[in-house]
């Protein structure tokens, strides 16, 4: 009888030992200050630096901490989520390096009972559709692209360029749905303004930075020495700036190039401050600061108050050029 009682008592103690850590973790997590992560695919780019800094600034103001992590590939994304889980983080904002990582990211977040929202690039499921139940904040990619194409068309008219004498360098990344929507939107606007379809030349890029833009643009420009005037567009301003550097290497005058990017960040500001104008005419500026702040605010309110963020929030942009960049920067708070 006593042996049976001791056996049952031992089992109860073992069960309690197994359960206690889980309960203690839950209590610690409930009492500890809120911690979230902010994961970005290219932590060295000014756009993402601004987003993460805006998240941290909001955290200081509203009493939560932000763990800033660079995640340039899928393996690092999953490792970052594990890292956040071990720190007791309750959620994260993410701009993933590959939108097709959606199901894997969702599964890993579920393992740690973490909420997450996406910013800039919307995650997709195995069928290519937006990942369900994951709030997103980004740009209206097609409309932003339309703005790029319209800005180029307006500047062509201002300079008196004839469509038949102009080539368009379309730097493409069709692996990233957002990139395709942006360049397709720009193409739509150009064609609607009378640009010749046969004068649009594709330049596939491998990376979405300056180097990727340069590497994509240089061989295409070199293959068409008969084209004397060029317009350039892509998914972001870094890529366009890389392409502009390629035109300079081939001694194409800056006055014969109209490059328009998307974002409105540090590299564009530096370009506008150069002593002489370059082929980088402008960029459709969107507030990276607001993207970082608003996506973080959405996540924190979801965690703290149970307020589910909107499923899909789309922001708009404004043309920023050498003439108005300081005013636009102040207006957008970037």
UniProtKB/Swiss-Prot annotation:
Chief localisation class: periplasm
Annotated Gene Ontology cellular component terms: outer membrane-bounded periplasmic space
Record's subcellular location: Periplasm
GO biological process: L-arabinose transmembrane transport
Keywords for the protein's UniProt record, in alphabetical order: Periplasm, Signal, Sugar transport, Transport
Domain of life of the source: Bacteria
Entry keyword Transport: yes
First and last residue of the signal peptide: 1-30
GO molecular function, one term: carbohydrate binding
PANTHER family, sorted: D-XYLOSE-BINDING PERIPLASMIC PROTEIN, L-ARABINOSE-BINDING PERIPLASMIC PROTEIN
Family: Belongs to the bacterial solute-binding protein 2 family.
Subunit comment: The complex is composed of two ATP-binding proteins (AraG), two transmembrane proteins (AraH) and a solute-binding protein (AraF).
Function of the protein: Part of the ABC transporter complex AraFGH involved in L-arabinose import. Binds with high affinity to L-arabinose.
Name this protein carries in UniProt: ABC transporter L-arabinose-binding periplasmic protein
């Amino acid at each position: 009888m006593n042996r049976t009682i001791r056996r049952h008592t031992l089992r109860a103690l073992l069960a309690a030992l197994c359960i206690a850590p889980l309960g203690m973790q839950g209590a610690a997590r409930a009492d500890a200050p809120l911690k979230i992560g902010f994961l970005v695919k290219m932590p060295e780019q000014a756009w993402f630096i601004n987003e993460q800094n805006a998240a941290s600034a909001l955290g200081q103001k509203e009493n939560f901490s932000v763990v800033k992590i660079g995640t340039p590939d899928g393996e690092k994304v999953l490792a970052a989520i594990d890292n956040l889980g071990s720190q007791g983080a309750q959620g994260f904002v993410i701009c993933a390096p590959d939108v097709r990582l959606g199901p894997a990211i969702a599964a890993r977040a579920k393992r740690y009972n973490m909420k997450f929202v996406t910013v800039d690039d919307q995650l997709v499921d195995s069928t290519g559709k937006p990942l369900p139940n994951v709030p997103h904040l980004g740009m209206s990619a097609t409309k932003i692209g339309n703005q790029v194409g319209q800005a180029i068309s307006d500047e062509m008219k201002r300079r008196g360029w004839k469509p038949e004498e102009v080539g368009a360098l379309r730097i493409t990344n069709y692996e990233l749905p957002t990139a395709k929507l942006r360049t397709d939107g720009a193409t739509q606007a150009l064609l609607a303004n009378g640009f010749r379809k046969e004068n649009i030349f594709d330049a596939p890029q491998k990376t979405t930075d300056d180097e990727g833009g340069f590497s994509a643009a240089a061989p295409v420009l070199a293959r068409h020495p008969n084209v004397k005037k060029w317009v350039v567009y892509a998914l972001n301003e870094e890529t366009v700036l890389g392409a502009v550097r390629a035109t300079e290497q081939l001694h194409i005058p800056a006055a014969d190039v109209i490059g328009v990017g998307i974002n409105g960040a540090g590299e564009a500001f530096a370009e506008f401050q150069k002593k002489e104008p370059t082929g980088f005419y402008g960029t459709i500026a969107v507030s990276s600061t607001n993207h970082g702040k608003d996506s973080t605010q959405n996540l924190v309110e979801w965690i703290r108050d149970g307020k589910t963020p909107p499923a899909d929030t789309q922001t708009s942009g404004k043309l920023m050029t050498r003439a108005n960049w300081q005013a636009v920067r102040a207006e957008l708070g970037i």
